[in-house]
């Protein structure tokens, strides 16, 4: 396997900073970079794209074909596998309508996160334990190792599919607009980080985010399966409770602790030490910061749910992002209006 760079810096892996050190050093590095940029503007951006971006048309075509492939595969899996399974298990109608979406996402994110974990812990890549190493030996147009390129193709094409799926296939939720923005930002980050050869940090970002989606969809599946066929299944209820606790913990630990202190610290501060004139520094850090803000936004849902459980307002697990029955009825179009279908699930609500 091609090595991505030295396993450590001259003095070994740098200790992970505190939040205060991240803000102080990251902000200081950004200010220094802004002051030192004497020709910042569209001219510099155009030169940077011409000199440092390497993305061939066949690669974009492959990405688009992959997105179409994911969409076709999901439609086939929903019709041939997930819906028949929901019917055979006698799920309640509302749960049976939502189960295919969660099953699809659970299988994808379980596979993608497992592969990212393999790259970070089953190979020689040192990026998790030594995040600054993501920029060691960086050069414009450097070769992308095949194992990382495969991960990028799978993830990039899936997020291309997810933009379409959020609009036309998924259940419409209170955060669907933010989810759509998240998918667009993620796709831009995947494509641009590949073009500028920041793929090493990209693998770390994907690893730190996908685990929460695995646990979220696992929990939702067990919620759907705990009441079926006129019976209450305690094993699924227990799995849902444990999954909910694990999901909340992993969201904070992976997305709000490790992600800023490993990824944002490396991109905002350490990158300039390794590559002083690193191209599109502000562009990538702005997108990563936006991703952090969206992680905080969704964490508020987790905190709100925990508060409702502790105060006795909620007695069973539910997705606070989903519209309840009363809201759904009030948001449905009148009979005289043309109904807007949300893909395979239900009416879409704006």
UniProtKB/Swiss-Prot annotation:
Pathway: Lipid metabolism; sphingolipid metabolism
Something else known: This protein is produced by a bicistronic gene which also produces the GDF1 protein from a non-overlapping reading frame.
Function: Ceramide synthase that catalyzes the transfer of the acyl chain from acyl-CoA to a sphingoid base, with high selectivity toward stearoyl-CoA (octadecanoyl-CoA; C18:0-CoA). N-acylates sphinganine and sphingosine bases to form dihydroceramides and ceramides in de novo synthesis and salvage pathways, respectively. Plays a predominant role in skeletal muscle in regulating C18 ceramide and dihydroceramide levels with an impact on whole-body glucose metabolism and insulin sensitivity.
Tagged with keyword Lipid biosynthesis: yes
Modified sites of kind N-acetylalanine: 2
Main localization category: endoplasmic reticulum
Membrane topology: Multi-pass membrane protein
Post-translational modification: Acetylated. Deacetylation by SIRT3 increases enzyme activity and promotes mitochondrial ceramide accumulation.
Impact noted for substituting residue 183 to A: Loss of ceramide synthase activity
Catalyzed reactions per annotation: a sphingoid base + octadecanoyl-CoA = an N-octadecanoyl-sphingoid base + CoA + H(+); sphinganine + octadecanoyl-CoA = N-(octadecanoyl)-sphinganine + CoA + H(+); hexadecasphinganine + octadecanoyl-CoA = N-octadecanoylhexadecasphinganine + CoA + H(+); sphing-4-enine + octadecanoyl-CoA = N-octadecanoylsphing-4-enine + CoA + H(+)
Name recorded for this polypeptide: Ceramide synthase 1
Listed EC numbers: 2.3.1.299
PANTHER family registered for this protein in UniProt: CERAMIDE SYNTHASE 1 (PTHR12560:SF58), LONGEVITY ASSURANCE FACTOR 1 LAG1 (PTHR12560)
Record's keyword terms, sorted: Acetylation, Disease variant, Endoplasmic reticulum, Epilepsy, Lipid biosynthesis, Lipid metabolism, Membrane, Neurodegeneration, Transferase, Transmembrane, Transmembrane helix
InterPro entries named among the record's database cross-references: Lag1/Lac1-like (IPR016439), TLC-dom (IPR006634)
UniProt entry tagged with the keyword Cell membrane: no
GO biological process per UniProt: brain development; cellular response to dithiothreitol; cellular response to mycotoxin; cellular response to UV-A; cellular response to xenobiotic stimulus; ceramide biosynthetic process; negative regulation of cardiac muscle hypertrophy; negative regulation of D-glucose import
Organism: Homo sapiens (Human)
Listed GO MF terms: sphingosine N-acyltransferase activity
Subcellular localization: Endoplasmic reticulum membrane
């Amino acid at each position: 396997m091609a090595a991505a760079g030295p396993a450590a810096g001259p003095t070994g892996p740098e200790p992970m900073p505190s939040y205060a050190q991240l803000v102080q050093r990251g902000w200081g590095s950004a200010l220094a970079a802004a002051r030192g940029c004497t020709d910042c503007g569209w001219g510099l951006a155009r030169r940077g794209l011409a000199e440092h971006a390497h993305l061939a048309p066949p690669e974009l075509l492959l990405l688009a074909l992959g997105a179409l492939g994911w969409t076709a595969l999901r439609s086939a899996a929903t019709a041939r596998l997930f819906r028949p399974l929901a019917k055979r298990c006698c799920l309640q109608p509302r749960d049976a309508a939502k189960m295919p979406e969660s099953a699809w996402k659970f299988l994808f994110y379980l596979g993608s996160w497992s592969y990212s974990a393999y790259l970070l812990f089953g190979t020689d890549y040192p990026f998790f334990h030594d995040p600054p190493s993501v920029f060691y030996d960086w050069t414009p147009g450097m070769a992308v190792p095949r194992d990382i390129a495969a991960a990028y193709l799978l993830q990039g094409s899936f997020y291309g599919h997810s933009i379409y799926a959020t609009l036309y296939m998924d259940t419409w939720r209170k955060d669907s607009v933010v989810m759509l923005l998240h998918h667009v930002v993620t796709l831009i980050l995947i494509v641009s980080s590949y073009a500028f050869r920041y793929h090493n940090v990209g693998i770390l970002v994907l690893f730190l985010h996908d685990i929460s989606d695995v646990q979220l969809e696992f929990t939702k599946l067990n919620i759907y399966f705990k009441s079926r066929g006129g019976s209450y299944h305690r094993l699924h209820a227990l799995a849902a409770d444990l999954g909910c606790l694990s999901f909340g913990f992993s969201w904070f630990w992976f997305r709000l602790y490790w992600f800023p202190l490993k990824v944002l610290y490396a991109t905002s501060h350490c990158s300039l030490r390794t590559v002083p004139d690193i191209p599109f520094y502000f562009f990538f850090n702005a997108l990563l910061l936006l991703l952090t803000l969206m992680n905080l936004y969704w964490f508020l849902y987790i905190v709100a749910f925990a508060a409702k459980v502790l105060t006795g307002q909620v007695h069973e697990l539910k997705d606070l992002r989903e519209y309840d029955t009363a809201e759904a009825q009030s948001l449905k179009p009148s009979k005289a209006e043309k109904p807007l279908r949300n893909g395979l699930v239900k009416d879409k609500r704006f």
